[in-house]
Amino acid sequence: AHVEVPNSLY
């Protein structure tokens, strides 16, 4: 997968 700007991957 591709993530540009990870906000909150908690």
Curated annotation (Swiss-Prot):
Q: Where in the cell is it found?
A: Secreted, Cell wall
Q: Does the keyword Secreted apply?
A: yes
Name the predominant localization. secreted
Q: What is this protein called?
A: 34 kDa cell wall protein
Question: One GO CC term of this entry?
Answer: extracellular region
Q: Which organism is it from?
A: Nicotiana tabacum (Common tobacco)
- What phylogenetic lineage does the species belong to? Eukaryota, Viridiplantae, Streptophyta, Embryophyta, Tracheophyta
Going by the UniProt record, its keywords in alphabetical order are: Cell wall, Secreted
